[in-house]
């Protein structure tokens, strides 16, 4: 991701604040009182940039996440100005229990507004964290409380959805695990959050200019008052500041290369690894030296997964895959990303056996071509909730494309950019079938539906042959066509967008709109809401 990387620089920054007071009253869920006349306490905004800390694990149902700026070392003394939750990249690894009532206080110590979106978690609409759609962005010095029940076990993640193309880019994300009541026990349960950063110092100026331009050009982009006057500026900054070839530092849990800690195991242990892609690029992951099973995708279990070996799991932006294996091959073994891009070799860690005293013979092979894991044919072919030939209340086609508007590149759904894209208008209880078609010649489009899971029914006109696949994020590659289905069982206004957030910012967004639904907040033009 675009990160402001600086070599051997200790950064300190004084944020100039005006009209300071001690007002720190919390927001209620309607989040309506957000005018510019509200003043901030000096203690509510960080005035000195500290270094990041080690990512902590939170295992309770009520806690606080503080959005704050930190200086973060990626590798080899390369420092970035990161935006963090609780001072680390990634933010805390949150683990809650199925059925728990969760209460999270978001405290904003940044100079810009923020929110938290619970990616994949089926929360009430007013807890989804989408500025201008479900809430007003949380202003500097303010606090907002998210409350919901952890209903569906699985591997999820959280991230800012305010100007996400930049704020997620800076590090505002973390993992969110709902542990099931009937979940299998594992001796080791690791979470690996994948990301990519940038070392070209020229990107710093580019990012600063982009942030400033988007702050001016994208203001007021909420569902009640969006217009397209700033479309040209948005597209221009997209193309200027988000050259994917410039990402050359790939990370696992915020570190790259030798700075990534090993994963320790003992012989005979059952090990679970949760892989979360918080970046904007797909990553092909290879586990060396062990047979393994892919037990879930986007947190949803796969029926009777079979054992595989030396297959590459391609994880698209926003997706999650969980694997399990038995530690039955003592030694030191790589878990690494495959590919040819600069930075790929930095995304690797070691599976390291305790008490192993032999010679470690494994070597990285990130350039090798290996078979690709095929989710469409994996697991036991049982009947899911939906079938291709059943009756549906609504059928919809989303033709995804990369197009030109003058000299600018835009990303369209049915040849339109948000907010001109057609919404999916549903009634509660509707069964909805959606055809996703990628007409782009080069770009993947990992499509993410908020507030719902969908079942993948077919790929390129052929029914899936493996386990029923239930997801919230599906990567549609150039030329591919998928049919998915979901039940409209969570009233609200929900985003359905590409999770390459560069594409979303440049137009590839639509909404699922429930008939008769009215949000319980009032969009505030002064909140500077930027839903992508």
Regions found by a protein language model. Name each.
Residues 1-9:
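Bacterial N-terminal signal peptides that target proteins for export
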Residues 16-19:
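C-terminal motif of bacterial Sec signal peptides marking the signal peptidase cleavage site
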Residues 21-64, 168, 173-210, 308-431, ...:
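Extended terminal and domain-junction accessory segments
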Residues 29, 63-179, 282-316, 333-345, ...:
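Histidine- and aromatic-enriched segments that form or immediately flank copper-ligand environments
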Residues 94-98, 263-268, 325-326, 424-429:
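Extracellular and analogous surface-interaction loops
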Residues 127-130, 134-140, 149, 194, ...:
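Histidine- and aromatic-rich segments of cupredoxin/plastocyanin-like copper-binding domains
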Residues 191-267, 276, 401-403, 409-416:
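Acidic-aromatic/histidine active-site loop/patch
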